[in-house]
């Protein structure tokens, strides 16, 4: 049976890539596409907006107007995603969430919703980035206690949250491995006379410039040597294809909260 996908934010950069990814994938089809109220794209064919030709799916501004989907893929903003979660819980729809920038209350709302529906919630849907998460855990076990750890990330000028969700996830994987709390050990800004660096800090640096899709590098730096683990994305299709892969994997799950580590079966590495 063909899995039907709904996409919110269909007219955005990521939304257009998601439409293309669904169209190219086997075993799935686009069932619904949505944009914010007042968007000039409402009523347009989703495929034409994505530049792949007509799909017969018109963009709507209300999830209640088109429930012809099994899984909703959401790469929007926290306030919108939280409303979409309520709809999916009420209507028994599964979700793939790529939105970043949630506060603790937002994350708890996702956790609560996952008691009733199945959700994949990840900061990054790239296969490569999720492999990097595991490599960081390995490096932290070997070098984390005596090295300075810094996370450097760069994204396009339009990204609204900083550090990126992926950078924070990298820090969380490292902190958990080392038995540290990122909230107390993370350093997100340095300016002026800061004093010497504390050994147990996990530092973050953010770049916003041009059209950078996404670049992340983690340093494990000691005196005399430095190990760098890095990932660079050159196309949003990497994330879109990963999200569709997650949706297909999620189709067999009735409820629960998962991430790409589960989807890719990386827990045993």
UniProtKB/Swiss-Prot annotation:
In its UniProt record, which GO terms are filed under biological process? diaminopimelate biosynthetic process; lysine biosynthetic process via diaminopimelate
Per the record, the similarity remark reads: Belongs to the DapB family.
Q: Name one GO cellular component term.
A: cytosol
* Reaction equations catalysed: (S)-2,3,4,5-tetrahydrodipicolinate + NAD(+) + H2O = (2S,4S)-4-hydroxy-2,3,4,5-tetrahydrodipicolinate + NADH + H(+); (S)-2,3,4,5-tetrahydrodipicolinate + NADP(+) + H2O = (2S,4S)-4-hydroxy-2,3,4,5-tetrahydrodipicolinate + NADPH + H(+)
EC number, as in UniProt: 1.17.1.8
This chain's protein is named 4-hydroxy-tetrahydrodipicolinate reductase
- Source organism of this protein record: Actinobacillus pleuropneumoniae serotype 5b (strain L20)
CDD domains to which the protein is assigned, alphabetical:
DHDPR_N
What InterPro entries does the annotation carry?
A: DapB_C, DapB_N, DapB_N_CS, DHDPR_bac, NAD(P)-bd_dom_sf
